[in-house]
From Swiss-Prot:
Residues 634-647 have a biased composition (Polar residues). This is MAP kinase kinase kinase mkh1. It catalyses: L-seryl-[protein] + ATP = O-phospho-L-seryl-[protein] + ADP + H(+); L-threonyl-[protein] + ATP = O-phospho-L-threonyl-[protein] + ADP + H(+). Keywords: ATP-binding, Kinase, Nucleotide-binding, Serine/threonine-protein kinase, Transferase. GO terms for biological process: cell integrity MAPK cascade; fungal-type cell wall organization or biogenesis. The active site is at residue 955. It comes from the Eukaryota. SUPFAM superfamilies: Protein kinase-like (PK-like) (SSF56112). May regulate cell morphology, cell wall integrity, salt resistance, cell cycle reentry from stationary-phase arrest, and filamentous growth in response to stress. Activates the MAP kinase kinase skh1/pek1 by phosphorylation. The keyword Cell division does not apply.
Amino acid sequence: MAADIGSQSSGSLEERFEQSLHLQNVDKQDWSLNSVLQFLKLYKFNKEWEDVFIKSRIEMDLFINLADQSKAEEFAFKNKLSKESAIQLSSCIRKTLLAPSSTRVPSKNSSYETLTYSAKDSSDDVFTETNSGFRSSNQNSSLKSFQSVPDSNVNVFGGFGGSVVDNNELLSTGKNSHQTTSLNLEGSPINLHAYKGTVTSIINDDSRNINKKTLSKQPVSEHKEKQTSFLRRFRVPGFSRDKDKTKDCPSSNSNPFHLASSNVKTLDASLDQGEWVPRIHRLESQIGLISKKKSFVLATMDDMKFTVVDITNVQNATQLRKLIAKSMYLDISIDQFDLFLTEVGGAQYIEILDDRKLDIARLYSDEFGTIKFFVKPSQNEESGMDSDTYLSFGTKSSSTYKADDDSIYHRKEDFKKQPSYPVLTSDFEITDAGPNLSLSGHQPDNKYYKGFSSAPNLAVVPELPSRRFRGFEKIRGAKGEMATKILDATEAQSEKNKFTVCRPHKKVTLKMPLNSGSSAPQSPSSNTSASVLTRNFVAHRDPPPPPTETSSLRRKNTLTRRPSIRHARSSPYIDTGHNEASKFSHTSFDPKASSKSSNSLKESVEALSEIPFEDAPALDESDLSGDPFWAIQPKQSSSQVPKENHHNIQSKLSINTEAATDLKANELSSPKTPEYCRGDDRSISLSPLSYRLRKSKHIRESPPSSKVINSGNWEVRPSADDLYEDVDRFFPRYDLDKVLVVDQSRMVSSPSKVSIRPKMKSVRLLAREASEARKEIRHNARRNKSGNLLRRSSTKLWGSRIVELKPDTTITSGSVVSQNATFKWMKGELIGNGTYGKVFLAMNINTGELIAVKQVEIPQTINGRHDQLRKDIVDSINAEISMIADLDHLNIVQYLGFEKTETDISIFLEYVSGGSIGRCLRNYGPFEEQLVRFVSRQVLYGLSYLHSKGIIHRDLKADNLLIDFDGVCKISDFGISKHSDNVYDNDANLSMQGSIFWMAPEVIHNDHQGYSAKVDVWSLGCVVLEMLAGRRPWSTDEAIQAMFKLGTEKKAPPIPSELVSQVSPEAIQFLNACFTVNADVRPTAEELLNHPFMKCDEEFNFKDTNLYDMLCKRKS
């Protein structure tokens, strides 16, 4: 045994110790010094070993490590003990630790192997590793090899714990004791002596089932006398010592599971071998470990949100069903829903659990909630269930919801523990954990909902996520009845329309009451279930009939006058008016004039375009109550306008489309431009403004403008204005006209108008509005004669749900980005590289802000080296995120949030135009001294702020300093930064990190005393020298030479002789102060701000420097 186990790596062996100890509920703390001494006495080790153990305090981990033969021999050699006794000690420790395990949970590095016995091995110390643990494999070995192990019975189900059982005690009926009859039981991976599928535990009896030859050498009485309470502590709790007890193991051919003794209750008498067992994964790793006190199951209706149900006192399936319904607040009888077994993420819901199967599944429950039930309306009740009862599924309410005239459905009882908000996602899915949308004044009385004036209105109610199993079944190849359900007409419609219905087999159209002034008849059902929506129903109003020759163009005005131009879908009939005092009436139409509809429509539009709009009255929101409409117009209405009308409308409104090359110069020349408030940006093809946008887009397909740099040449990052102006070039993978966001400026604030769907606008228009806002801020700053532009902080994303909008996502008319729910962003072109990842341009499509995202890819390869690399990367990113979350300073790159996925980690930062100081030096050359003072002062402000927050940057250099077109310098890249409680005290835990040429001497060689934040001051001196000289410090030395001069000779970077005569004495004094070798004397960042070199000329203007001209030239 010593030879075999000694050949194994110590790491692998220690892992098996951990597994064995874990299975037996044995803590390393049990191996106190007293227990170790008791162990030595038990195995009759001499007094010398006891003295050495007491002197060296060998206990706990130190004692367990001696199970490694090489470590035991090394310990014996060090303490002048015999090598043979060390080998014996190692063998005894391994027996004690490994032998008691009768089952072992498979880890990621091991799998179930077959229990083997090698008859040719004659050594007493040879063990064979199996899925059942570590057992002696020598059938002829004497009791010497296991004399300290008490007799016990064998684990049958794989979940019972017990002590080691020698192979001589496992005898098969009618077989020789030197032979092993191995039978793979159905549902059990453990090979034991068995016959006809029934496992029989062979018990250690003093006068039975023990090899006579072995007994002659070592009496059993002597074996029992050596049993002590010391070894009994390693038995698994709940271990049964009943003699000759035969147990039947229920099994399944497809997926075996084993019951723990502490979990097994009285099974039904009809449960024979081969009966049904729950098909739940990962169950076998949770059973047979400890005796539990309570039993829990999880219940869900969407495989994402689970409810914990305590079934400790449940005795039968009926009680279980009632308890699940009560826990999920389902006010229905137990006959109205079915239960299925499920897992997180979903499963195939094919097998309904009847009472017998449910009772069996109940027996498999544990304190970990391994058993999970999926609750689904029963097939018999589903078709006959009314809409209100069906909508009660998935909601936490003590009663069903009743829809009234003003709402679709509303909450009757709020969540008491966890608040949940309705989220409008890209595929129009409501991810609400429980409470329904509150509409028409039914506001929830909940402190978490304060600040929301009303809930958003939806055109359709989506299908519950719990019913989205059709695609999963198709992929897995469903057959029979399930395949028939998948391929029926109802299922086939889901391929064309993602909008789903709450009632699967009955369509209920939306009916809304009209006001008294409407000519439409009042529907008798308009007052009942008015807002129950259907699966294939697209909400809209019917198009108006064609006008007659005598019909007037005047009708009820619903347009809104706003100060800025908004773009939305136009209508063939544009509402007009002459004065605010004029009264409007509905246009009357003659249905007999259908033959002249096209000509009349053309004339109406032409005449309309000449009517002024200054005197149009403002929108009276009270008029909307009797004139319901939807944001999406029917497709057939667009065909009523001839194509030539586009040119007529455009020409009448005097839009200069021929000069649309420059988007900024091409503004509407007439203040009479109407605002198409009733339309939608998803289809703006009929509006004059859309024609202008289409033409400008067509012109942009020509060679790119000189104002935008090549996307592959990022020497200078373009300004935000240039990015907004040519947003298609920097986000080429997206169709910006189809990505929609909610227009916050038009959100309905009145609770009585929540049935009106919010207006939408495209990301292209959102970007344009953001650009106009920036120009307005700049204009106001110049008008107020402000020296610097007002700083505008980016939107913080910490704590919010952040989702990347993939370019290959199918974007439909319902793909809307909600402003109040999640932050969605689009990834643009690559703009740089960081310490661990790449930096991309991005846009927050909720707000239109341009941001930068640093993405770090997590290695997915499974091996030890990559696992450590993965851990190092994740730890580094987590440390960076924790440090920078609260930083907010003008001279620090602002961190906005982060998003973690299985493949990468994204950190969101503010977008800084321009470029790094290092790149500017390589392209431009040395900076003027006044410019160096200007930049250095800003860096010192940023460093002083970082040090006040307890952060040491440790990688300050020119490449990590960004400067924008306004001359603002920002410190970036906190990948190796470190937090310290006292930044100016030496921290011995800090390792050598940073770039060699910018390192301080104490970083390289500090005699284990560590260093402080003053290393950043040294690095600042290197940056100042770099800006003045135009090249890096130690420019004439290699990295090894620089390390030797810094660490051994304690020298500072040399100042070029030609530079001394070109710069002022203050600059030389500043460099000498930064390059003070003694860190205790070196000044702090706060002190350096008072240095004479930090005083800038009051007349200095960054835009008058050659660097600014170079940046603008590179940009263009």
